[in-house]
Regions:
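Structural signal for interior beta-strand "rungs" in well-ordered beta-sheet cores
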Residues: 1-68
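An N-terminal, well-structured beta->alpha segment
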Residues: 71-129, 135, 215-229
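Structured core elements
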Residues: 2, 49, 55, 113, ...
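Short beta-strand-to-turn element immediately C-terminal to the catalytic PLP-Schiff-base lysine
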Residues: 14, 87, 179-183
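Fold-independent oxyanion-binding glycine-rich loops
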Residues: 79-81, 116-117, 166-169, 183-184, ...
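Gly/Ser/Thr-enriched, mixed-charge loops and adjacent short helices
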Residues: 93, 97, 174-229
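N-terminal small/polar loop signature for handling phosphorylated ligands or for N-terminal nucleophile
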Residues: 111-176
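Generic secondary-structure signature for well-ordered alpha-helical cores
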Residues: 61, 100-108, 134, 138, ...
Length: 229
């Protein structure tokens, strides 16, 4: 095994040929598998299992087990939003936390749209995102099933600060795609993506008290509004 300078390992296990670069912090009851590489300034939270031959990229905060794939990155967003295998890369718990991170970039009392397509999977994750957003004091317009162009139009029509649209990847019913949009209905900037990623990785959520939870507005007939407009 190799352990770099300034590392801290608390009550955890390093398996055969695991490599820790400088200033890695591993907290209680975690396991780093054989031949895994943990890069500089990574934080591994308690009770985490990293399976063999994984690479954790620098500055990442690992807060869930790393089983599938070969790498874990600090970055959540890809070239076009966020995508991943349902209940592997993207779980309901992940979606709730990401919803809280997204909501935390707004002031309390702000308003956003959350929509999905008709699949049961997309609808389930829509509700997970909504729970996270509401938990940080942001009001949500819960749209009935919409296609992406209608979701973008809804943001402009309702004059809200942004929106999330959840759908399945074309040709793969096990892969989810999540689009994040700004107040004009356009995809968010890379700067905004980084704000969300930082809030998510640090768990720096603007949690609110019970009496600050905002309304959930259920909109079931937006297509009719769209036709009229």
């Amino acid at each position: 095994n190799y352990i770099g300078h300034g590392c801290e390992i608390r009550g955890s296990i390093l398996c055969n040929k695991a490599k820790l670069k400088n200033y890695v912090h591993i907290f209680e009851n975690s396991i780093v598998g054989d031949n895994s590489i943990i890069n500089e300034r990574v934080v591994i939270k308690p009770n985490i299992k990293i399976w063999p031959q994984k690479t954790i990229e620098p500055l990442a905060i690992v807060d869930r087990n790393i089983i599938w794939g070969s790498k874990h990155s600090k970055s959540i967003f890809g070239e076009h939003g966020i995508s991943g295998i349902i209940n592997v890369d993207i779980s309901p718990e992940f979606a709730t936390r990401l919803g809280a991170a997204y909501g935390s970039i707004f002031k309390k009392g702000s308003k956003v749209v959350v929509s999905s397509t008709t699949s049961n999977s997309a609808r389930m994750f829509k509700h997970a995102f909504i729970s996270g957003i509401l938990s940080v004091g942001v009001e949500v317009f819960n749209m009935s099933s919409l296609l992406t162009p209608l979701a973008r139009h809804a943001i402009n029509f309702l004059s809200v600060e942004g929106g999330i649209h959840i759908k399945l990847s074309e040709g793969n019913p096990n892969k989810l795609k999540v689009d994040f949009m700004d107040s004009k209905g356009a995809s968010i900037s890379r700067v905004t993506e980084r704000k969300i990623e930082n809030s998510f990785s640090r768990e720096d959520f603007k949690r609110c008290s019970g009496d600050e939870i905002c309304r959930l507005n259920n909109i079931t007939d937006f297509k009719n509004y769209y036709v009229r407009s």
